[in-house]
């Protein structure tokens, strides 16, 4: 009996944090290992959010391979966190491997088993046949992956658009292999849903050249562009425009410069000779130049804020500059993006954004998805990667094409689609899932004390109460000293501070008199009493931090 199980540890009903699991009998294949940025109410010092890897940790020995289809954070950003817990072979294309290896070195991850594979290839992992096919997306070397089962292939498309005019092989969509896979028999097709609400094809609306070229043509001074590092397609468009208008280019980001070196080393794309100026040779009084400011997530907006505030050592904006914001906000970065635009308008009135209604992100639109479904002709269709409305929109595309509703599988994170002997089982089981907050490289339990403490501090403040007692007699010899931050306006609430001190004294003195004094227990008792009193007087629940310092004194 053949048994295929399909489920997600992240990436369903959310933007980012993509991680999908295909179980072929006893073998586990993982596709993607991504993160997402925290929303404004999740921040609290959290840098990123990853899937909970508990299921994979418990089943580590069954994992035969982890496929990372391209170098975006939403599919690769959690890989270092994953490898701190699980040892597994990683399969990725050469450019993605270079990106990851730099990140792994920074985080001290070593001895990773990385298999560099071509975008269009077939090979075996154990007895399982794997086929890959190149896709057109915003970063080079992207691919989709097909895993052979006894009942047909399980295919994951990754991000893709259908574009027949791509000049560079590293961005080309492999229509031939997609057609070949369809003819071999596809059991289940997993496609992205982010662009499933857009009519038509994404191409040629994914290009910014037609929108940005008139700005280049009319610009008299410098041109400053912001762009995400991982949108290499857009970076190359800007470089080619600079070359067309005979302007030099300065790339102002170490990671983006490294990526362009990687592109040249791998033979994918080379910046035209003599066009690029290194940052150390850049002068702020240069006019005939395009400055490309790269970055990821919110870092790019903070970098531009620093430049606009004249705090940067290399670039200062001038009122003659033309600024093109080609890095639209992504979920979790909206506030930083808005602040950046305000800062830019204070320095120059020539600020242009990329119209997201005219320029599509490089995700499959409705007609792209229809073509993929038609060519693959899967038995089961599984929308993935997107918010719930996008998953439903994607499902409706297949429904409109005549697919039976019972053959369209819309899952939530953790829900398992189980296909036995080619037939979907009605009983729906689940695996444990959740969000893991990462701060400073360390994982924080989303429901744990660290985040609860941070939330308390951000809303209700903190009160610290300190006393010094004689180690031998337990007599109070110093304090109490009460410090309040973010709780009350001290001028109007002296009586509260005095009463908190009295509560602390009485708690210690009573415990000593009753011969039950214990430092830890006294602090816990004082914390509880002070919290009740402050709640009654102020309506707040601040963090209460009692401190009892015991010292030896000589008579």
Where are these regions (language model features)?
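His/Asp/Glu-rich metal-coordinating catalytic cores
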Residues: 1-67, 72-283, 302-313, 335-338
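Short acidic-glycine loop/turn motifs at beta-strand connectors
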Residues: 23-26, 148-151, 243, 419-421, ...
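Structured loop/turn residues at beta-strand edges in well-structured enzyme cores
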Residues: 61, 128, 183-184, 286, ...
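Conserved hydrophobic residues forming the short capping helix/wall of the S-adenosyl-L-methionine
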Residues: 104, 398, 534
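Flexible glycine-/small-residue-rich
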Residues: 134, 149, 293-295, 467-469, ...
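Hard-cation-handling environments
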Residues: 197-326, 330-355, 359-499, 503-516, ...
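C-terminal edge-of-domain segments
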Residues: 456-458, 468, 545-555
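C-terminal tails and terminal domains of large nucleic-acid-associated
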Residues: 519-552
């Amino acid at each position: 009996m053949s048994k295929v199980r399909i489920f997600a540890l992240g990436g369903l009903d959310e933007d980012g944090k993509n991680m999908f699991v295909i179980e072929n009998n006893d073998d586990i294949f993982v596709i993607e290992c991504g993160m997402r940025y925290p929303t404004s109410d999740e921040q609290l010092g959290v840098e990123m959010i990853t899937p909970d890897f508990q299921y994979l940790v418990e089943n580590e020995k069954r994992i035969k391979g982890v496929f990372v289809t391209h170098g975006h954070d939403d599919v690769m950003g959690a890989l270092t966190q994953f490898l701190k817990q699980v040892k597994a072979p990683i399969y990725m294309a050469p450019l993605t491997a270079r990106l990851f290896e730099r990140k792994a070195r920074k985080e001290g991850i070593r001895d990773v088993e990385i298999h560099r594979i071509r975008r269009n290839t077939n090979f075996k992992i154990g007895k399982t046949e794997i086929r890959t096919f190149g896709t057109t997306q915003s970063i080079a070397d992207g691919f989709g992956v097909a895993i052979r089962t006894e009942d047909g292939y399980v295919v994951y498309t990754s991000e893709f658009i259908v574009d027949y005019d791509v000049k560079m092989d590293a961005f080309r969509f492999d229509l031939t292999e997609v057609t070949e896979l369809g003819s071999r028999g596809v059991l289940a097709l997993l496609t992205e849903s982010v662009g499933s609400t857009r009519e038509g094809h994404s191409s040629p609306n994914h290009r910014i050249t037609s929108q940005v070229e008139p700005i280049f043509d009319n610009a008299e001074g410098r041109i400053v562009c912001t762009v995400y590092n991982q949108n290499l397609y857009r970076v190359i468009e800007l470089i080619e425009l600079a070359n067309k208008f005979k302007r030099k280019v300065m790339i102002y980001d170490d990671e983006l410069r490294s990526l362009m070196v990687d592109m040249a080393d791998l033979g994918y794309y080379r910046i035209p000779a003599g066009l690029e100026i290194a940052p150390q040779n850049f002068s702020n009084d240069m006019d005939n130049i395009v400055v490309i400011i790269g970055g990821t997530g919110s870092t790019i907006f903070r970098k531009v804020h620093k430049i606009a505030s004249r705090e940067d050592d290399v670039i200062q904006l001038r009122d003659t500059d033309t600024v093109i914001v080609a890095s639209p906000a992504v979920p979790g970065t909206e506030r930083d993006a808005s602040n950046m635009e305000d800062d830019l308008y204070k320095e120059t009135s020539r600020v242009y954004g990329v119209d997201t209604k005219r320029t599509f992100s490089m995700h499959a639109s409705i007609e792209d998805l229809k073509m993929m479904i038609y060519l693959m002709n899967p038995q089961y269709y599984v929308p993935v990667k997107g918010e719930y409305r996008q998953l439903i929109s994607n499902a409706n595309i297949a429904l409109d094409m005549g697919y039976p509703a019972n053959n369209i599988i819309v899952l939530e994170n953790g829900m398992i689609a189980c296909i036995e002997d080619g037939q979907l089982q009605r009983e729906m089981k689940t695996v444990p899932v959740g969000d893991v907050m990462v701060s400073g490289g360390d994982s924080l339990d989303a429901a744990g004390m660290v985040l609860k403490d941070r939330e308390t501090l951000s809303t209700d403040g903190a009160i610290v109460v300190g006393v010094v007692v004689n180690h031998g007699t337990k007599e109070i010899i110093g304090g109490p000293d009460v410090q309040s931050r973010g709780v009350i306006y001290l001028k109007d609430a002296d009586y509260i501070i005095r009463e908190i001190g009295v509560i602390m004294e009485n708690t210690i003195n009573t415990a000593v008199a009753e011969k039950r004094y214990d430092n830890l227990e006294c602090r816990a008792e004082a914390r509880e009493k002070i919290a009740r009193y402050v709640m009654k007087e102020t309506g707040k629940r601040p963090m209460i931090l009692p401190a009892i310092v015991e010292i030896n004194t000589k008579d």
